[in-house]
Design a protein with these regions (language model features):
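A short helix-loop-beta-strand connector motif used in the catalytic cores of GNAT acetyltransferases and
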Residues: 36, 49-63
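Acyl-donor (CoA/ACP) binding surface of acyl/acetyltransferases
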Residues: 1-15, 21-26, 62-168
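Conserved GNAT-fold acetyl-CoA-binding loop/helix
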Residues: 28-49
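Alpha-helix boundary/capping residues
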Residues: 20-23, 31-34, 51, 141
Length: 168
């Protein structure tokens, strides 16, 4: 499947809201919930507008992962951009019906290609120790695991977060 990364805009709010609502339960199985308020339409739009302000000021870059017809398959972001050490944090999520098709692997590859345009030389990522698919996606795209781990609690279970770094 051919995908493309499209910069997030205000016009994406309604379709993105539907995507998030459709995938809420799936996402919350592997990452902490964004809370019930996030799924209230007006609050979602406010938060979306706030993210676009971050993007406008250069502290983050938000992309939608879309197919050839323009449907949202997922999201991918570079957040917490640091202009001094030219770094950012990677985050992504793929809708449940689109997993296992290589979309995340390709989206990360495409995003890495954008790094030079955003003056980013280092990208950091985290994933849980049990998320083997994400670990594979990161290593396939040139990320290396670093000896930094932290413990998080999700649904009452302790999990290790594994840190990865990609550098130009």
């Amino acid at each position: 499947m051919k995908i493309q990364l499209k910069a997030c805009t205000a016009g994406d709010a309604d379709e993105l809201y539907a995507f998030e609502c459709d995938n809420r339960r799936y996402f919350e199985q592997s990452i902490p919930s964004r809370g019930d308020d996030y799924y209230v339409p007006d609050i979602f739009r406010e938060r979306h507008a706030a993210l676009l302000e971050e993007q406008k000021h250069g502290s983050s870059v938000y992309f939608l992962i879309k197919n050839e017809t323009g449907s949202i398959l997922g999201r991918i972001n570079l957040v917490d951009r640091n202009s001094i050490d030219k770094s950012a944090q990677l985050g992504y999520r793929i809708g449940q019906s689109h997993t296992g098709k290589g979309i995340a692997k390709e989206a990360v590859r495409l995003l890495i290609m954008h790094c030079q345009k955003f003056y980013i030389d280092k990208v950091e990522a985290k994933t849980t120790d049990g998320n083997f698919a994400s670990q594979k996606i990161l290593t396939h795209n040139g990320f290396r695991r670093v000896n930094k781990e932290e413990v998080v609690v999700l649904h009452g279970h302790r999990m290790m977060l594994i840190h990865y770094i990609w550098a130009r």
